[in-house]
Amino acid sequence: MPTLVRRRDLLKFGAAAGISAIAAPAWAQKFDIWEPRWAVLDNLHTGERFRAVYYANGSYLPDALAEATRVMRDWRTGDQHFIDPTLFDALHAIGGRLESRKPFQIISGYRSPKTNAMLNRRSNGVAEHSQHTIGKAIDLRIEGVELSNLRAAATAIGAGGVGYYPVSNFVHVDTGRVRQWRGS
């Protein structure tokens, strides 16, 4: 049975997220806290789209974060896990750096531990303790944007991990420690 994120949990996190805006990572402190932030995400596996402002008037918006969490769920199991709002901030910054409002195409968002273990057995390119399993990572691309430019933008903002997978045609972005790697 799929794990669902309860709205009450999102509201609790929303209160904490307001505090986290004060203690934002260095790269995110360049944002004007009163300016709205938006994300446009297309889940390639489910056909669902998230297009909304997720942050406005100095606060993350719990309903928007809940919808983004749903769109980024593990499409294999239906499980959901709250997605780190600073991941959306990273995507917002990447889109701004690329001067693009095109949707980020989701290859992989949240992965349940079960899905991650299965993928780890099939491929040495899947980390056993992946940031995907804690809602802090996304594998993506943007139609019409060179993958190398997407990687450069993700690296330039310094948000966390950036993996470049040119053969598989995606870039991994996470909000863990800053690091870079190249996969296949």
Stretch-by-stretch model annotation:
Residues 22-52:
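C-terminal segment of N-terminal export signals and the immediately downstream linker at the start
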Residues 4, 37-42, 125-184:
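Catalytic cores and adjacent binding grooves of peptidoglycan-active enzymes
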Residues 43-45, 54-56, 108-110, 142-144, ...:
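A mature extracytoplasmic/lumenal domain signature
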Residues 57-107:
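Active-site acidic/histidine clusters and adjacent loop/turn architecture
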Residues 88-92, 116, 147, 151:
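Extracytoplasmic/secreted envelope proteins and their assembly/folding machinery
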